[in-house]
Curated annotation (Swiss-Prot):
The keyword ATP-binding belongs to this UniProt entry's keyword annotation: yes
Family: Belongs to the NadD family.
Record-listed E.C. numbers: 2.7.7.18
Official protein name in the record: Probable nicotinate-nucleotide adenylyltransferase
Protein purpose: Catalyzes the reversible adenylation of nicotinate mononucleotide (NaMN) to nicotinic acid adenine dinucleotide (NaAD).
Pathway: Cofactor biosynthesis; NAD(+) biosynthesis; deamido-NAD(+) from nicotinate D-ribonucleotide: step 1/1
Alphabetized UniProt keyword annotations: ATP-binding, NAD, Nucleotide-binding, Nucleotidyltransferase, Pyridine nucleotide biosynthesis, Transferase
Keyword Nucleotidyltransferase (UniProt): yes
Designated gene of the protein: nadD
Catalyzed reactions: nicotinate beta-D-ribonucleotide + ATP + H(+) = deamido-NAD(+) + diphosphate
Single GO molecular function: nicotinate-nucleotide adenylyltransferase activity
Species per Swiss-Prot/TrEMBL record: Lactococcus lactis subsp. lactis (strain IL1403)
GO BP: any one term: NAD biosynthetic process
Pfam families assigned to the protein according to its UniProt record, in alphabetical order: CTP_transf_like (PF01467)
EC category: transferase
Length: 195
């Protein structure tokens, strides 16, 4: 296939528990800087590295993502890991995506803190044949990797989903940390309340 007709799609995987402005800014900046057709936010079903007890249902995480991205045409959703079920391994996901979309080049977006863990990723050598890694550089991390990684500079917000869950549990509204429509959804659904 002619390289010029290929789609360029970024993937930002995560638990998104909840989605926040740091996730959104990262996705949008990569879309713009790499001239991607779209960046798809891809919620994990059962992440292999996160304590399941801390993860709310996929239904709520997907709804929050839908609310968060609805105003940005550069962003979309990829629900393959939710639909597939089970543990979410990037290699398995990318194998399915590349087989289903042979006209698409995928760019997997990670924070620079994840680059050092690439050697521990499931089937990393095979994964590298399916995807280009894009890492956003942080001042406090080393921009080196034994694997091919495209490094981008973008402002990174010091926001974490853990911090936001703790704020909600203490009845502190994290205004400006995540979209207001997501805050409203969390409050309506009474998510992240202490039991």
């Amino acid at each position: 296939m002619d390289k010029g007709n290929r789609k360029k799609v970024g993937l930002l995987g995560g638990n998104f528990n909840p989605i926040h402005h740091a996730h959104l800014m990262m996705a949008d900046q990569v879309a713009q800087q790499m001239n991607l057709d779209k960046v798809l936010l891809m919620p994990e079903n059962i992440p292999p590295h996160v304590d399941e007890k801390e993860t709310i249902s996929a239904k709520h995480r997907v709804k929050m993502l839908e609310l968060a991205i609805k105003e940005n045409p550069r962003l979309g959703l990829e629900l393959i890991e939710i639909e597939r079920g089970g543990k979410s391994y990037s290699y398995d996901t990318l194998k399915l995506l590349t087989e289903a979309n042979p006209d698409t080049d995928y760019y997997f977006i990670i924070g620079s803190d994840m680059v050092e863990y690439l050697p521990k990723w499931y089937k990393i050598d095979e994964l590298l044949k399916l995807v280009t890694f894009i890492a956003l550089r942080r001042k406090d991390t080393i921009s080196k990797s034994p694997y091919p990684v495209t490094w981008l500079d973008a402002p990174l917000l010091p926001i974490s989903s853990t911090m936001l869950r703790e704020m909600f549990a203490k009845n502190i509204e994290p205004t400006y940390f995540l979209p207001q429509n997501v805050i409203d959804y969390i409050k309506t659904e009474k998510l992240y309340k202490k039991r």
